[in-house]
Structures are given as structure tokens and as C-alpha cells.
A protein has these predicted regions:
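Short alpha-helix within the catalytic core of nucleotide-sugar-dependent glycosyltransferases
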Residues: 21-22, 48, 86, 100-104
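Glycine-rich, basic loop-to-helix element that forms the pyrophosphate-binding segment
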Residues: 68-84
């Protein structure tokens, strides 16, 4: 059962996003207890392709990418909140790295 949804809004920062995702998949919480929802906010770079490659390399993790057309991070955060499947939602930015245990 998914207990925690981690939402990451992003806009044209594919390289930073991948680094953030690398830190997310190192979490020590069991994989079936969390999901990560990345919200692409009008990205025009290779965010979608790089996310798809990352997700394919980590099939054991619940990673999803959704698109949000509303301009700005508040639209992206709200979209992520609507997409979240868990009762508890955490947010990080696409340039952040989380330590092990962050999702505990």
C-alpha cells in the first residue's frame, strides 16, 4: 500500500531532475510504500525522454510523469497533489537531493 507520495515539479531542468531522482530511488522505505510523481510544467527540453529512460532503468520504483500546462510552480504542485495516491504527500524541488530515510 502506498503511504507516501513524493511530488517533484520541474521545468526544463532534466539534468537536475535525474540527479534528484537518483537520490529518491535510494530511499530505504520499502518500494511498495511510496511513489514519486514528477510534474513537468511546460518543459520543452528533454525532460520527458530522460525521465522515461530513468523510469525504465528503475522498474521496481513507482515513478510517474504527468504534464501540467498551467504556468508556474504552484500549478505544478497542485497538479502533483491531485495526482498523488497516498494519504501523505511530500514535495521537493527538482534541484534537491534527499538523504536516505527522508521518506520515513
Amino acid at each position: 500500500m502506498i503511504r507516501i507520495s513524493l511530488v517533484i515539479p520541474t521545468h526544463n531542468r532534466a539534468a537536475q531532475l535525474v540527479a534528484a531522482l537518483e537520490s529518491v530511488v535510494r530511499q530505504d522505505l520499502p518500494r511498495d510504500e511510496w511513489e514519486c510523481v514528477v510534474v513537468s510544467n511546460n518543459s520543452t527540453d528533454d525532460t520527458e525522454a530522460r525521465f522515461a529512460a530513468f523510469a525504465a532503468a528503475h522498474p521496481e520504483c513507482a515513478l510517474r510523469l504527468v504534464a501540467e500546462d498551467g504556468p508556474g510552480v504552484s500549478y505544478a504542485r497542485n497538479r502533483g497533489l491531485r495526482e498523488a495516491q497516498a494519504p501523505l504527500v511530500a514535495f521537493i524541488d527538482d534541484d534537491e537531493r534527499v538523504n536516505e530515510g527522508f521518506l520515513r
